[in-house]
Design a protein with these regions (language model features):
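Active-site-flanking structural segment that lines cofactor/substrate pockets
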Residues: 43-77
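Short Gly/Ser/Thr- and Asp/Glu-enriched loop/turn motifs at secondary-structure junctions
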Residues: 62-64, 215-219, 252
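A conserved non-catalytic segment of reverse transcriptases
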Residues: 245-309
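Active-site-proximal segment of RNA-dependent polymerases
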Residues: 1-9, 96-154
Length: 340
């Protein structure tokens, strides 16, 4: 059994410098807000307050502010729960900073997203490497999705996951306060993605040990292998493991030959011989190019430049010839550099 971590919340670990760093991290891309500027303008004072809240165990979570959005990528309705900047968001960052290096070391290598250095590009390179170097064990793919992953991870499950990893009672109490501040993992909390990854640690281990290659991006995951029957038999183990955490798979899981259908994940479709852009993303690209031709703005120039830069990751020669003909990159850069 892996040794549990202790002595996390101590005078030596929770320093004013750590609290200042946490406040600055929490303030990124929010510096125009009055509530954030007020804290940054009195950084020393607020860092001392934050330190005492954590060391004394007097932190109490505030109510969340609910916000409704439509996710442009998937066109799904999302409900965000925004915590107050101080003390809540700052406490969340301190809580993760205290254990981040040791937590990262325990997470699965290919459990990606919301971890610095492990984004879409990291996942893309991993899948491409497997397909290019191991054709035998990438013949079939099992593609699944965990149903309402964040909504179904409950506070008691988060608490149990941390108790297996950490024995410091003060730190466990802090984590439980954050976890029990909502009925599930709220979209909008910095801690939510870390909590999810820790809860799914045993699940990741099971998948990794029973398949040739495994990758999980938030709640979507793929398992690759040479035998279709083995992948199908693995479904029962996966379902039982998830059930222990109060989770279950969507019914639209798929087992298919990679060469015939391609692996649709991370915004691409992967084949052994090439990679294509996902159809939905290609449509967004075409619309962006069409809007640019109709009316040129700095925002549209930046959006189009970003998508053009992304073409190096997939087979895009025919796409560029058909939909980007006549678009001048120098003109795009000139518009993108404008402030308004």
């Amino acid at each position: 059994m892996t040794k549990r971590l202790g002595y996390i919340i101590t005078e030596e670990n929770v320093t004013e410098e750590l609290c200042k760093a946490a406040i600055k991290c929490a303030a990124k891309k929010k510096t125009k807000r009055y509530s954030v500027r007020r804290v940054l303008n009195n950084l020393d004072s607020y860092a001392k307050k934050l330190r005492r809240l954590i060391l004394d165990g007097t932190y109490e979570p505030s109510l969340y502010k609910e916000c409704h959005i439509v996710d442009r990528g998937s066109n799904k309705h999302r409900v965000l729960h925004k915590p107050k900047f101080f003390p809540d968001q700052c406490v969340h960052h301190v809580a993760i900073k205290l254990i981040e290096p040791r937590l990262k070391a325990r997470l699965d290598t290919y459990a990606i997203a919301s971890i610095k250095g492990k984004g879409i590009t990291y996942g893309y390179k991993a899948i491409r490497r497997w397909l290019d170097t191991d054709a035998r064990h990438t013949k079939y793919c099992l593609k699944c999705d965990i149903r309402h992953c964040y909504d179904n991870i409950k506070p008691d499950v988060v608490g149990r996951a941390f108790e297996k990893f950490i024995k410091d009672k003060k730190y466990i109490d802090l984590i439980k306060k954050i976890a029990y501040s909502h009925t599930s993992l709220p979209l909008g909390n910095y801690t939510s993605s870390w909590f999810e990854n820790l809860v799914l640690l045993e699940f990741d281990k099971l998948c990794h040990e029973n398949s040739a290659h495994y990758l999980r991006y938030v709640d979507d995951f793929i398992l690759l292998g040479s035998n279709k029957r083995k992948l199908r038999n693995l479904l029962l183990k996966i379902s039982l493991c998830l059930a222990e955490q109060g989770l279950w798979l969507k019914k639209n899981y798929q087992i298919f030959p990679v060469d015939k259908r391609g692996i649709d994940i991370l915004g691409y479709r992967f084949y052994h011989t090439h990679t294509l852009l996902r159809k939905r993303n290609a449509l967004h690209f075409m619309r962006t190019a069409r809007k640019w031709r109709k009316h040129k703005t700095p925002f549209r120039a930046r959006s189009l430049l970003s998508r053009i830069g992304n073409t190096k990751w997939y087979a895009s020669k025919n796409f560029k010839e058909k939909y980007l003909k006549g678009i001048n990159r120098k003109e795009l850069i000139r518009y993108a550099n404008r402030r308004y």
